[in-house]
């Protein structure tokens, strides 16, 4: 039987390639070759960074949900950087912290532009396939995701585009290289549409508000160029948008509910106590359910949301009134406290209204730093901030879960806010971990975590350069602010204002300037005027917290560390001496760690870090290391250990690998007949270096060492 084998070259008739320049580097889009079954797909090549972006949508809406089910996944493949994963299976597992944070950065600008009444599942996936350290995979993924959605048949109000903005030597730099990022005072990820700012995520070295606005404006100008490029592609190959089945309530039913129950909802919500408000709303919703038995649980949730939203927004826009009776720029009652937990290294509790966070600071050695097995620029982290949000903090009766994306994002925000004020590792050679436990939540827990971390760090004696505080600003709009619509910002939003408002603009910083920003919105973007007003309100609120709340409680870091904290010391040794300190098979360093109850970390450049709970143990380890790396000096006294006995004297080890001879005549101040009459193998004895011959052999004297020690004691006694 004969077999025929056909061979043909696969062609891609829909393949298209588009090229432009983005912040001075080539930016290439390829479509029509890969992922033909996705609703929208694009391979982004920025420099040598390659990110494959796909978007898909379910054919039918998901039943029983009262939200838009959007999933955004940023997948980091270590092969992109030529690395094999460090896990046991040598395979990528669950998304790491960096991938989760990148997913959130892309999620936040694209989510508000989807129809709010759509319930079809939408999944956006960005896979990093090649990484050029000078060309951000995150920005490439954001722009690629925007393009993929815009050119797909999925309903969406985009596109948006993103850019990374740095500040190097006082100059604004767009999409800075890896080297520039290392020296930048600003790390700003910006997303925008043609006319509005859609997302801000920033870390900064105390940058002032004016400079921040300049960076935002500069980034927006570059974004407009990318948007023109994306719109050109969509105009050429974009698909017609699909229709979808919107989730709607019967207008007559909603009008009936408003007429009967809106005043009741207003009365229930007119309180500053979240528990009282929630309890007062329950019977109202029970009455609505009884009046309309055909409503589903999702329908009732939507009605409750619309009722509360109408009350909150009407009060603010029409009456300038807030739910809890505060003024528009008034901060909730504040309280701060330090030193709550006796055995921890540092603790601080910050309370703002019904929001309360307790932060605990723990100090560790350099070995405790977090190793980063991902595609981030940082190989390890010496400052770690973890944020925990237990169910009891919102009065829920359920078992706690492992940290989700929100917890990781809030922890990272507080982490970025504090990093600029931390001491250099050379000055303070500790790994620092802060854990923020949310005890009660009614809005702005991430900003309370920033304040709590400042308190805990100073209570622990960490010499931070300046205290940091955080506060948020909200927004209510009626119509498009860009075209005459009304809007109002308010300082220090609580939970109900966050839930029913249009913005959560979070800013952390010192008296000098901003250290972190995170902006979440539910509208299609913000004007420059709104951003500027939010920054200014947060600045004033931040200064009030620093001066009136934090400073009276703890004005500066404690002078001494907790007695339970490890004492850290650092020193430099010659690189060629590292092997001597470690010893064969690690014998020397292991013996020192065991003998002095300490941890010793040695870096490739000769930096040595010693940590011990007892300061004297650490100092003894330092002295031993010095004896190993330094040549013995004539006249120096050492505490050594007898290793061998001979007829003519005793050999004494004054440092690992360094032995000298104490002649029998130098053992004591009287005639010694037998060496074993004075010392035995293993005895610790004081010896003085008396001579080093041309061959490097060391001559020691116990007699001279004892005489010198006795003389010093006598002199000390006379004084």
Features from the language model and the residues they span:
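Conserved phosphate/anionic-ligand binding catalytic regions in large, soluble enzymes, centered on
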Residues: 40-43, 135-153, 338-361, 442-462, ...
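Single-stranded RNA-binding regions, centering on S1/OB-family and related RNA-binding modules
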Residues: 564-568, 575-719
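Mobile "lid/hinge" segments at catalytic clefts and subdomain interfaces of large enzymes
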Residues: 153-268, 457-559
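Flexible, glycine/charged-enriched surface loops at secondary-structure junctions
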Residues: 116-122, 157-159, 226-244, 275-276, ...
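Long, basic N-terminal domains or extensions that often function
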Residues: 2-245
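Extended amphipathic alpha-helical scaffolds
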Residues: 2-58, 62, 242-377, 566-580, ...
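Short beta-alpha junctions and helix-cap segments that line functional grooves
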Residues: 40-41, 174-177, 185-188, 370-373, ...
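Glycine-rich, flexible beta-strand/loop modules in the N-terminal catalytic cores of phosphate-handling
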Residues: 38-122, 128-130, 135, 194, ...
């Amino acid at each position: 039987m004969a077999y025929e084998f056909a061979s043909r070259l696969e062609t891609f008739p829909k393949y298209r390639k588009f090229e432009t320049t983005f912040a001075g580097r080539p930016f290439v889009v390829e479509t029509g070759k890969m992922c033909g079954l996705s609703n929208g797909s694009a391979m982004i090549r920025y420099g040598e960074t390659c990110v494959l972006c796909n978007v898909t949508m379910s054919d039918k809406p998901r039943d029983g949900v009262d939200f838009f089910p959007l999933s955004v996944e940023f997948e980091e493949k270590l092969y992109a950087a030529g690395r094999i994963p460090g896990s046991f299976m040598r395979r990528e597992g669950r998304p790491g912290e960096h991938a989760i944070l990148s997913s959130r950065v892309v999620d936040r600008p694209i989510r508000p532009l989807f129809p709010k009444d759509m319930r079809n599942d939408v999944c956006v996936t960005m896979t990093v396939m090649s990484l050029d350290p000078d060309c951000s995979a995150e920005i490439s993924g954001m722009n690629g995701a925007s393009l993929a959605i815009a050119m797909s048949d999925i309903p969406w109000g985009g596109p948006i585009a993103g850019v990374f903005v740095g500040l190097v030597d006082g100059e604004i730099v767009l999409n800075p290289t890896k080297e520039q990022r290392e020296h930048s005072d600003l790390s700003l990820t910006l997303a925008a549409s043609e006319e509005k700012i859609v997302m801000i995520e920033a870390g900064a070295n105390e940058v002032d508000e004016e400079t921040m606005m300049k960076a935002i404006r500069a980034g927006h100008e570059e974004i407009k160029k990318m948007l023109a490029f994306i719109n050109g592609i969509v105009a050429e190959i974009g698909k017609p948008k699909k229709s979808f089945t919107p989730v709607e309530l019967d207008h007559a039913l909603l009008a009936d509910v408003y007429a009967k129950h809106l005043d009741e909802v207003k009365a229930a919500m007119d309180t500053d106590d979240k528990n009282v408000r929630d309890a007062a709303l329950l019977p109202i919703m029970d009455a609505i359910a009884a009046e309309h038995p055909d409503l589903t649980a999702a329908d009732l949730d939507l009605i409750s949301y619309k009722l509360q939203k109408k009350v909150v927004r009407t009060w603010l826009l029409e009456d300038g009134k807030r739910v809890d009776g505060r003024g528009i720029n008034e901060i909730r009652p504040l309280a701060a406290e330090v030193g709550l937990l006796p055995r921890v290294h540092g603790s601080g509790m910050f309370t703002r209204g019904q929001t309360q966070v307790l932060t605990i600071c723990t100090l560790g050695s350099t070995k405790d730093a977090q190793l980063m097995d991902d595609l981030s620029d940082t190989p390890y982290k010496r400052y770690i901030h973890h944020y925990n949000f237990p169910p009891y903090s919102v009065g829920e009766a359920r078992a706690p879960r492992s940290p989700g994306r929100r917890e990781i994002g809030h922890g990272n925000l507080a982490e970025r806010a504090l990093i600029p004020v931390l001491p250099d590792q050379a000055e303070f050679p500790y790994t620092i971990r802060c854990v923020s436990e949310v005890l009660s939540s009614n809005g702005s827990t991430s900003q309370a975590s920033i304040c709590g971390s400042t308190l805990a760090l100073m209570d622990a004696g960490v010499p931070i350069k300046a205290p940091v505080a955080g506060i948020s600003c909200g927004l209510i709009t009626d119509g498009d602010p860009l075209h005459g619509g009304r809007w109002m910002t308010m300082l220090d939003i609580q939970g109900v204002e966050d839930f029913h408002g249009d913005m959560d603009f979070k800013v952390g910083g010192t008296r000098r300037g901003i250290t972190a920003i995170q902006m979440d919105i539910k509208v299609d973007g913000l004007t420059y005027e709104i951003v500027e007003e939010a920054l200014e309100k947060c600045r004033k609120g931040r200064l009030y917290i620093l001066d009136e709340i934090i400073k009276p409680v703890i004005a500066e870091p404690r002078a001494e560390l907790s007695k339970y904290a490890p004492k850290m010391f650092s020193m430099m040794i010659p690189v060629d001496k590292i092997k001597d300190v470690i010893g064969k098979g690690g014998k020397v360093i292991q013996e020192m760690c065991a003998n002095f109850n300490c941890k010793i970390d040695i870096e490739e450049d000769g930096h040595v870090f010693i940590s011990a709970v007892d300061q004297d143990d650490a100092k003894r380890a330092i002295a031993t290391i010095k004896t190993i790396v330094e040549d013995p000096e004539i006249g120096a006294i050492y505490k050594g250990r007898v290793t061998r006995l001979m007829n003519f004297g005793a050999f004494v080890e004054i440092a690992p690998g360094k032995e000298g001879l104490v002649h029998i005549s130098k053992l004591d101040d009287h005639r010694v007949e037998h060496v074993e009459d004075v010392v035995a193998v293993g005895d610790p004895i004081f010896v003085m270096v008396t001579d080093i011959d041309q061959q490097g052999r060391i001559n020691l004297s116990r007699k001279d060492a004892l005489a010198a020690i006795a003389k010093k004691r006598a002199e000390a006694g006379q004084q």
